[in-house]
Swiss-Prot record:
It catalyses: apo-[ACP] + CoA = holo-[ACP] + adenosine 3',5'-bisphosphate + H(+). The keyword Lipid metabolism applies. One of its GO terms (molecular function) is magnesium ion binding. The gene is acpS. It comes from Rickettsia africae (strain ESF-5). The lineage of its organism: Bacteria, Pseudomonadati, Pseudomonadota, Alphaproteobacteria, Rickettsiales. It holds the Pfam family ACPS. Its EC number is 2.7.8.7. It comes from the Bacteria. InterPro entries: 4-PPantetheinyl_Trfase_dom, 4-PPantetheinyl_Trfase_dom_sf, ACPS, Ppantetheine-prot_Trfase_dom. Keywords: Cytoplasm, Fatty acid biosynthesis, Fatty acid metabolism, Lipid biosynthesis, Lipid metabolism, Magnesium, Metal-binding, Transferase. NCBIfam families: acpS (TIGR00516), pantethn_trn (TIGR00556). Its cofactor is Mg(2+). This is Holo-[acyl-carrier-protein] synthase. Belongs to the P-Pant transferase superfamily. AcpS family. It is an enzyme of class 2 (transferase).
Length: 131
C-alpha cells in the first residue's frame, strides 16, 4: 500500500550562504550523528551539496509521511546514509515510527549545480492511515 510521496528542491547557493554565516550550526541542526560523521570526512567544497541533498531528502521524506518537518517529525529524526553502491538508505527514528506498521522508504537524490532534488516514496504491506 502506498503511504505517501514527497519531493523537494533546494538551491545549493542558498545553502552556501547559510554555511558562510553559520558554518557549524547549520550542519548540526539538520544532520543526525551518523550524517555528521560523513560530513566531517568531506572536503569543504562538497559541504553545501551534501547539506542541500540531506535537507531536500528529509523534507521529501517528511512530506511523504504527510506531516512536514517540525510537524511531528524533525530533521534529526531522519538519517540519510548510502549503501556500498551509493543508493540512499533512509533511517527514521523509532520515536516517530513506533506507531506505524513496517514500511519501506524509497529515495532518489540528484544534484546539478545550482539545484538538487529529492523524491521519496513510502510504502507498506499493511493498510495504514496517517494523519
Amino acid at each position: 500500500m502506498l503511504i505517501g510521496v514527497g519531493t523537494d528542491i533546494v538551491q545549493i547557493p542558498r545553502i552556501e550562504k547559510i554555511l558562510h554565516l553559520y558554518p557549524e550550526l547549520f550542519a548540526k541542526k539538520i544532520l543526525a550523528s551518523k550524517e555528521l560523521k560523513q560530513f566531517a570526512l568531506l572536503g569543504k567544497i562538497n559541504h553545501a551539496a551534501f547539506l542541500a541533498k540531506r535537507f531536500a531528502a528529509k523534507e521529501a521524506v517528511s512530506k511523504a509521511f504527510g506531516v512536514g518537518i517540525g510537524q511531528g517529525i524533525n530533521f534529526k529524526d531522519i538519517t540519510i546514509l548510502n549503501n556500498d553502491l551509493g543508493k540512499p538508505i533512509v533511517e527514521v527514528s523509532s520515536n516517530y515510527t513506533n506507531t506505524l506498521s513496517p514500511f519501506n522508504i524509497h529515495l532518489s537524490l540528484a544534484d546539478d549545480y545550482p539545484v538538487c532534488v529529492a523524491f521519496a516514496v513510502i510504502e507498506s504491506s499493511y493498510n495504514v492511515i496517517l494523519g
